[in-house]
């Protein structure tokens, strides 16, 4: 007999789980269909393992770059990469257990299989043993997330994608990271700090080109300072596997670099092409992203989408979580106007040092408001944690303000601890804070964050 539900999520990642748990809390009969592991990209091959690696890299930096000036004579006999991986995976395992416990507590059925639409209300679940079953629902959420893109160049298969990084059992001696986005920058920083000879290849003049120019300039400076070899205007032509197992990346302009591991981090694409979406009539764009309105509705009644798969969305875990929860509030808790505001979403890049930002860059503000209406405040200093050492690291910050009242429409920072500063400032900016509001706030000294409220 076909099982029927009030609400089904296709995809057991952060967005799907958040939305289903919220709906279940209102007494709805809910299910999740997930072909792999609960938690999706974030928990298994994204935010969580990456952040563990980031912390590992911070420990390495503390020992190698900063400990001597603080009086610690530290001798590291060896770095056990396998132990780091073991600890990381054990932590992920505990998250899986937590997810399963919460879903069970909320009486959510979990189908460990692959979902394909049969019609707008019916889903076929396929299992590893070849068996199938049908389930139906009044409401269906598509939250399948994305997957890494691989370039169409000869020998691309010799490289690994960003997911594959977390399957490595040993630290590469030499590594090439191809990509200019936050994933590429984060992976390059981690691997470099852990001890790999690291090369970062970008198509244009710098990585993270969509960030504020102050951030980009500082990042490029720090990459060089930390020993990451940045290759600009780098267009891959071919990857050659050599007799000793090493890989040579050949660029279109003739440059060549030989490494042990090559990582493709050139972007992600939506995983919407494998769920038989076409039978539903749900509209997508040319990239396969699902077109939704501000309420996460598709063009088909009863079918919704959140997360990395939607057109014009922001590919961040907390965005998917927030959108999923608000969707369930609207559908099942009598809040007909509940939806996520995608403006002023704070973001962090876990580079070395980290980057934090919310709102418009200076060029974006000038384009939107006119140069005569934009005023910028900046601060540049050496992070105190590093200032007492020989490995001094810059910390740079910017406020972008508009109008006579100097409303803050953008806040940007790169430096030690910025990743933990940005959340609180995002609340203030979301509430419409002005430069005067920041000026009227007493600074906490000595901290990096005080610079945001003392700029002149």
Task: Explain the meaning of each model-derived region.
Residues 8-15, 19-36, 41, 48, ...:
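Flexible, glycine-rich terminal cap/loop adjacent to redox cofactors
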Residues 306-366, 437, 445-456:
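A conserved FAD-binding loop/helix module that cradles the flavin
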Residues 157-173, 256-334:
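FAD-site-proximal beta/loop scaffold in flavoenzymes
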Residues 2-13, 171-181:
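Beta1/beta-strand and adjacent pyrophosphate-binding region of the FAD-binding site
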Residues 109, 116-128, 135, 194-294, ...:
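A Rossmann-like FAD-binding core segment of flavoenzymes
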Residues 8-10, 115, 134-145, 177-178, ...:
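Short hydrophobic core segments
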Residues 47, 142-197, 229, 278-280, ...:
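Glycine-rich dinucleotide-binding loop and its adjacent helix/turn
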Residues 2-5, 21-28, 33-171, 204-208, ...:
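Glycine-rich flavin
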